Amino acid sequence: MIELLEKLFSRGPDSSRTQVKRRLQLVIAHDRADLDPQTLEKMRKEILDVVCRYVEIETEGLEFSLESNQRTTALIANLPIRRVKGAIPEWERGDK
């Protein structure tokens, strides 16, 4: 399970201590959020689908993580934007 979470929320190379700390924080946040890995992956894909309608993103710097403090758990998405796409068609905006 931790391997899947690491894959979903991987970051650049770091020291072992920092990686262990992040893993522990991720496990704690995961437990508090009560989300299974499949749900997190589905959320990640849906977020990317929506964002990609409006902007082109740099997949190399893409990062999703769960962060937790004493009161809340947050899903943090770092999505480097290459460029903003053109105008959004009326049918997608919901204009009538």
From Swiss-Prot:
Domain of life assignment: Bacteria
Keyword Nucleus: no
Pfam families: MinE (PF03776)
InterPro entries for this protein: MinE, MinE_sf
The keyword Cell cycle is assigned to this record: yes
Keywords: Cell cycle, Cell division
Biological process according to GO: cell division; regulation of division septum assembly
Family statement drawn from the similarity comment of this UniProt entry: Belongs to the MinE family.
Physiological role: Prevents the cell division inhibition by proteins MinC and MinD at internal division sites while permitting inhibition at polar sites. This ensures cell division at the proper site by restricting the formation of a division septum at the midpoint of the long axis of the cell.
Protein name as annotated: Cell division topological specificity factor
Encoding gene, per UniProt annotation: minE
